[in-house]
């Protein structure tokens, strides 16, 4: 499948931020906001868009996670090389993911979220086994309908009410592919929910059986103790009767 890389230089290239890049996969899915940074010795490198997680490192600083990124060394070198080439030449650069198809192959992973909030799950997709998009949300509206929300970042723009505007970092570029992708993500959500429920049922069943076995064992222990007590009482009664018989016999002999 063909992917096209485009870059634009920043008008104000401060703090080493030189430009921004985006890549479109098969003309149906775009990932953008990839920064081109000037590092030491004026060397350029690519920084993927990221967000601060709730985790912190050993210095209590927030840990960042990429919204999207290559997952194989081969595709990372291919993509980053194309971005830097496009930035230096000012031209679009095409790369081939090697699938031989016109549209991307999409693998979906969904993790359901327990609770009563509107976000029901988080999902990630992998494009052609080489590029991952994280932090896709599956949400429920007030009518109980599920919908997919692609990862987005806050911009410097505001709406009419003065609230910050957000824009998607990664998103389908055609209506047809958006519908196909959203349907696939929601299908995988239902599948993940079913699997989670099956696991919970199996766990509950195992817990119930273990509790039943424990109760049976405890009951057998009590029965055993009662049996031993009863056996001891019976032996004591026999001994008493034997002693009385012996005393009676001794009296008769005298």
Segments predicted by a language model, with ranges:
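Gram-negative host-targeted secretion-system effectors, predominantly Type III and Type IV
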Residues: 1, 85-109, 117, 137, ...
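Polar/charged low-complexity regions in secreted precursors and cytosolic/nuclear IDRs
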Residues: 12-14, 26-28, 42, 57-60, ...
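Histidine-centered catalytic/metal-coordination loop motif
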Residues: 35-85, 139-187, 191
């Amino acid at each position: 499948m063909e992917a096209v890389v485009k870059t634009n230089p920043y008008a104000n290239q401060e703090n080493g931020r030189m430009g921004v890049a985006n890549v479109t996969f098969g003309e149906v899915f775009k990932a953008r906001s990839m920064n081109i940074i000037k590092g030491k010795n004026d060397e350029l490198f690519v920084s993927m868009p990221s967000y601060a997680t709730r985790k912190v490192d050993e210095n209590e600083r927030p840990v960042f996670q990429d919204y999207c990124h290559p997952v194989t060394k081969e595709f990372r070198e291919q993509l980053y090389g194309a971005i830097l080439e496009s930035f230096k030449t000012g031209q679009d650069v095409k790369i081939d993911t090697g699938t031989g198809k016109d549209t991307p192959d999409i693998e979906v992973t969904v993790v359901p979220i327990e609770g009563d909030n509107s976000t029901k799950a988080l999902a990630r997709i992998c494009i052609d086994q080489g590029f991952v998009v994280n932090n896709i949300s599956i949400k429920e509206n007030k009518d109980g309908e599920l919908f997919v929300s692609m990862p987005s970042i806050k911009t410097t723009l505001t709406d009419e009410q003065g609230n910050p505007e957000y824009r998607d970092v990664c998103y389908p570029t055609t209506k047809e592919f958006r519908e196909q992708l959203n349907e696939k993500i929601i299908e995988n959500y239902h599948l993940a929910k079913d699997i989670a429920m099956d696991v919970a049922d199996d766990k509950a069943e195992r817990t119930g059986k273990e509790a039943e076995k424990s109760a049976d064992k405890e009951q057998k222990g009590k029965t055993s103790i009662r049996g031993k007590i009863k056996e001891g009482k019976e032996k004591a009664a026999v001994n008493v009767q034997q002693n009385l018989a012996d005393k009676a016999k001794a009296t008769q002999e005298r």
